[in-house]
Structure formats: C-alpha cells, structure tokens
Design a protein with these regions (language model features):
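Juxtamembrane regions of bacterial inner-membrane/periplasmic proteins
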Residues: 2-266
C-alpha cells in the first residue's frame, strides 16, 4: 500500500523581537519636554508683578540688594547713590548713545533681538570668550530689577519670561526710562542722574556729547572701567566707534565729531 504524499509544512522563523529602545527614547524625550513645561509653568506663576512699575518708580532693585550683600560679606558698607530723573530730564544724546550701543532695534523688537543674539554667540565662540552681549535693553532691565546675577539655563528662562512680560505691560518709553534710572554705572552708582552728578558734577540733562559717550562706553563693565578715565585702549576704541556711529546718524556736526576723535585718541 502506497503512502500518500503529504506536504510538509515549512518551518517559519520566529519574528524578531522588537527592541524597546525606540519607545524608551520617545518616552525620554517626552519626559524631558514635560519637565521643561512644568518648570516653565512654575517659573511663570512666580514671576514678579511688573504692573507695579508701570507708574511707580522703584527705589530699590535686585541688583542693588545683591551688590550691597556682596560688600557686607567682605565687612564693608556700600554707599548707594541713586537719583530718579524722568526721561524728559535726561540728555537726548545720552539716550541715543545708549540705544545705539546697547539695543539698536529697541523700538522694533518685542523684547528679544534674535539676530543680535546669533551674532553675539558667533563672535563669542570665535574669540573663545564673552566679548559681546546679546541682551536687549528689556532683558537687561529684567535682570537689574528682579534677578540676582547667575549663568544658568533657568535664570535665562526667568529673564526671558520677565522681559516678555515687561514688553506686554509697559510702553517702550517707560521701559527705557526705567532702564536709564536703575542701570549700574559704578559701585553703588545707579541711574543716569547719579552717574552724571558723580562723574561730571552736572545733571543728566546737561551732558555734553563727550560725557554722554563716556558714560555709555562703561555700561559693559562699570566696575572695571571709568567714565572719567581714557586710559583703557578698549574704552578709547569703543568711544571712537560710538562717536562715529552717532555722527553718521547726524546727531552732531563734523567739528564736534573731530573734537571727540581728538579727545578719545589721547
């Protein structure tokens, strides 16, 4: 009796087990994003009430308290010199010099100048040191009013959120007025009026082009550089460049520009 041939089932290879790495990576990214959102939310709900400075002039800022605490730790007392001046009583030349030097697109942006930040990062990476800041006037105001100096991602996030809140709440004119009245111009020296009186013995409204440029040039590091001294080569170059940019915008005439060049070259 012949056996009937039956087809033999081919052995099927077991399906390869899927490794969970893709899912793990996806969950990890999601977890990080959720963590960032949670921290951002926490920071946002604890932001200062910037409505308070819409009309009220602050008598004290975070940077003032921080500087005084630094001196106290060394057993010293820092004398605070601070006089308030409305924008109408600050030299237009000083205002223009600040805008040109610190934030040339102040009236165009909404708190951040992305192009300036990119250029600053590229220049700093090229020089392998911080030689150019990318912060707008609004960001600088946020730091001075509410934050202690620090270089952390969360600190930058706080600064960014406060800057955005300032831009939404205050007019550009008010932001500029606040900035010019709380910015540091030396140890214990805050605001344009205090700087003008201390450095040049006059009101901020009476500053000459040379004095305005000298004051603005030291904003980068008022604890290292002096507005009344021309000894630093870096300051001389910075002042010459700022004078040139102001002259190009017809903020003063050619004889004044030539006089400034002579002054800042010595």
């Amino acid at each position: 009796m012949e056996m009937e041939d039956k087809p033999v089932a081919e052995a099927v290879a077991p399906a390869p087990k899927r490794r969970p790495w893709g899912k793990i990576a996806g969950f990890s990214v999601l977890g990080v994003l959720l963590l960032i959102l949670v921290f951002t939310g926490i920071i946002y709900v604890t932001l200062p009430n910037v409505e308070e400075v819409r009309e009220r002039n602050p008598k004290e800022t975070a940077i003032m308290r921080h500087r005084e605490a630094q001196f106290k730790e060394k057993g010293k007392k820092l004398r605070r010199i601070h006089y308030w001046a409305p924008l109408s009583r600050i030299s237009p030349l000083l205002i223009q010099a600040v805008l040109i030097s610190e934030d040339d697109k102040f009236f165009q942006h909404e708190g951040f100048d992305w192009e300036e930040m990119r250029e600053a990062m590229e220049k700093n990476l090229d020089r392998k040191q911080v030689v150019r800041g990318g912060s707008t006037i609004t960001q600088q105001l946020a730091k001075n009013l509410y934050l202690r100096p620090a270089r952390t991602p969360w600190r930058k996030l706080q600064e960014a959120l406060i800057a955005r809140k300032l831009e939404k709440t205050l007019s550009k004119r008010r932001i500029l007025e606040l900035y010019l009245n709380v910015i540091e111009w030396g140890d214990g020296l805050y605001g344009a009026e205090a700087a003008a009186r201390t450095c040049f013995g006059k009101a901020a409204a009476e500053l000459t082009p040379a004095e305005a440029i000298r004051l603005v040039s030291v904003i980068i590091n008022p604890h290292r550089y002096s507005a009344v001294s021309n000894a630093s080569k870096r300051m001389r170059n910075k002042r010459l460049l700022l004078a040139q940019r102001m002259y190009q915008r017809e903020l003063f005439d050619e004889p004044t520009f030539q006089s400034l060049c002579e002054d800042f070259s010595q």
